[in-house]
């Protein structure tokens, strides 16, 4: 994990900024670099990245955004590099979402479509699944190499859905993955595939959406802290 003297950056989607936990009371302060009207009803100070970095006494910044895609995280990284100098020993954590449901493509009419349309033919959906893997791998390669080129140590994990990479073009090193692509943080926190069961839903999820409640965020943080301690990253 990032040293106390270095800076830790957290990139991610709504899970990383405490979506559904109520409007921020300002406790995140200048640490939350992506605070805007789109991120209403979010309490990043109660989300797992803040809990982890606060527990480890780290200097950190939050760059999460609701609905963020892997590709948008790359754009967010580029924005950060354009706007801020890179401090020594900076570590960047990229908390990846579901790469299939967060996939944009242009259809034959020139319209931008997000995700797989439910009424598409089977062969189209199968092709899009393959395209998602390629696009995600290319985007992660870019994030990885851009971090290294700018003196940033990249760290990757999947928050709530495992991902598949195209291994023939994957350029990332094994040590950059805090959690392997075949696993995800929610499985470590709640049990494999258990975030959707009734008990977990009632205890650890917001009643109105699929986001973790405050206790659920605490479990995510504990699972990640344990993983960090075991892997010494």
Which residues fall in each region the model found?
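Histidine-bearing beta->alpha loop at or near hydrolase active sites
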Residues: 65-70, 207-211
